[in-house]
Amino acid sequence: MSRIRSRNTGPEMTVRRELYHRGFRYRLNRKDLPGTPDIVLNKYHTVIFVNGCFWHGHEGCTKYVRPSSNVSFWEAKVKANRSRDAKVTAHLEALGWYVITVWECELSPSRFLSTMDEVEASLRANRFRFLSDKASEKRRREAGSILRKRKRADVLSKEKSSLSGHRIPKTVRSLSDSSEE
């Protein structure tokens, strides 16, 4: 296991090469994100994990075969990997990132182009969703700002009406009126 790399694996390099060929630009292994995603596309607010079928326990895959020796160790290891993958995915989604998982078996020559077409379609859809989410968030902020301004104006008008019975020097009143504008 000491020779197993966590970065720059063959499947990861294949996906990266194809993404670059299709015009996508990305960052690698961002440590500030949970799980240190293999590929991060900031513009699309999307992360891509390229998982090996054996190490991450891809169910129903021919490349995931449980070893016959030391069965309890391998079952625990694969179970822990699956659990960690689920937690990392949930955490990233909670932070607003879109998560794509590409399995090693999906990169076989017969399935490679269709897999990468699906990844590209997901990226483009994520970009659209991210921009629409961003725009709706901006509209929510603006609406909240308008409501806060209205409340502030109501409070100031109530204060003025409650203070109208008191004698307020003209200089103070003029300063108060100019600060509202």
PLM regions: where:
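Nucleic-acid endo/exonuclease domains
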Residues: 1-101, 105-181
